[in-house]
Amino acid sequence: MRARGLTELRNAAVEPEIMDLVDVLQKMGAIISVDTDRTIHVEGVDELCGYTHSALPDRIEAASWASAALATRGDVFVRGAHQSHMTTFLNTFRKVGGAFDVTDEGIRFYHSGGDLSSIVVETNVHPGFMTDWQQPLVVALTQAQGLSIVHETVYENRFGFTGALRKMGATIQVYRECLGGTECRFGQRNFYHSAVISGPTPLTGADIVVPDLRGGFSHLIAALTAEGTSRVEGVNLIDRGYEHFMSKLESLNAAVTRLA
């Protein structure tokens, strides 16, 4: 912003959060524009000023709670969730068997009753299906009828979290091949980037160690879905991306206790 002359960022991300940052910088006095080819142009200015701005709600967290509602046959209202930022997820959620009601205040996500349906999902950059949406959804797909396929095209080796799900009784196999119908850059690079989920399978409680942020929340969803008691270690990793998640779980009447 303060550099002299024109700065050009090519192949830039254009997710809603990035565009929201562009709005903030413009409010602060920046001269910044975004082209349709994902090029961001920034003209240097002498100074930036203060601003007032309401940050976007977290669409990853919203989708995580939606997947939890689907897996547990529950009902949750996510205050502040934006329909326009979650179009691809909402279409997938509905195809699997979830239902949602959009209001000015947020989105209500709930299980519509009956059996969940299997689906093929491929992750992609915005406006595609976010890579951070797939882990929570995989838990819900363990409860769907038939074979579901999730093809990860954004990051390699994102299915490590499925080991704990298999320990709980899920039938999930991971593959190096591209199984979603589209060849991606990981197809010939020996990465496990496709998963086949067979369901429905009852899950049972287990002792789990959280591997990372998104995988960890997915394990919480699995624990809520499972019969019996689960012990999930390393939940401090989840705090990083899910603010006050324990109080939110308690507000949903989840039988959960944090030991440390």
Q: What kind of region is each of these model predictions?
A:
Residues 1-260:
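Short, structured segments at the rim of ligand-binding sites
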